[in-house]
From Swiss-Prot:
The keyword Nucleotidyltransferase does not apply. Part of the 30S ribosomal subunit. Contacts proteins S3 and S10. This is Small ribosomal subunit protein uS14. Keywords: Ribonucleoprotein, Ribosomal protein, RNA-binding, rRNA-binding.
Length: 100
């Protein structure tokens, strides 16, 4: 199990990303469409003035059962250990142990 403080930090980041998503997208679109270098510099400063944790690439994929940050399968949102144990118990519909 991951530390509760790390899980809480990640939840806080997700909320910030949601709150600033529209503003961040509009600034980035304006930055891409701007031709004048001074205008681009001004828009870039506005983007930098946003909170650091509102960038979506700072969110960490975590297992929803244990909170582990590594070995997480996107399709299930589970870490590899939980995926294996839940698949063996039949808790994941459609997942079967392979044999050939």
């Amino acid at each position: 199990m991951a530390k509760k403080s790390m899980i809480a930090r990640d939840v806080k980041r997700k909320k910030l990303v949601e709150r600033y998503a529209a503003k961040r997208k509009s600034l980035i679109d304006a930055f891409k469409s701007a031709k004048d270098p001074m205008e681009r510099l001004e828009i870039h400063r506005k983007i930098q003035a946003l909170p650091r944790n509102c960038a979506p690439n700072r969110i960490r994929n975590r297992c929803w059962a244990t909170g582990k940050p590594r070995g997480v399968y996107r399709d299930f949102g589970l870490c590899r250990n939980q995926l294996r144990s839940r698949a063996h118990n039949g808790e994941l519909p459609g997942v079967v142990k392979s044999s050939w």
